[in-house]
């Protein structure tokens, strides 16, 4: 009501000034309503979507957070506490990290062979210099903030999902060169990472699926990248996300 009254008074004042031959001054900038304020966002590499945690288990989600901390500290290994690491924990760990800390998969040689179940250790080597890694982390932080800048406090889950989807996919380009590249090469690991999709706007199907998973997770949307056979593209990865109580596929 206060804002409406202020606007009405400003309009009346402008009319009075014009009728007297005066020039109205610029209407004062009114404060943003809470709903119009920028979305409150803090980058957190520990965030793991609830659906992902249910898929891999809470022990492995906790392991992913330990790996993130060790990676950010410049270390090359971590010893995990006792827990449930059944199945293929090396693959599941990498899967979680792609949507939690995209830089990790882009600048290390990690794959499922680097998870030693017997010793409960995870190891990796860096494929870029410390300076390059810090530049990549800074670039991801800046880019993520730019993505989140399209959101407002009043945006519900549907608005957040659609706005972030558009922000990611509008400049996106498919990396056809890497579609059949050497999966063991450093170049392939970097160019098909979720980091490349986020910062360089380039990648293949799972680059963008995991990149969108990262953005949705940071924005408080439950989601998980899923893989299956596509009628037109063969083996494919896309995103499944919960939006306002319903599950949707995003591709």
Where do the language-model regions lie?
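Secondary-structure boundary elements
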Residues: 133-197
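A short, highly charged nucleic-acid-interacting micro-segment common to nuclease
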Residues: 194-208
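Alpha-helix capping and helix-loop boundary segments enriched in small/acidic/polar residues
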Residues: 66-67, 200-203, 227
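Extracytoplasmic/periplasmic C-terminal soluble domains
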Residues: 183-185, 203, 214
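Linear, non-domain "peripheral" regions
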Residues: 20-143
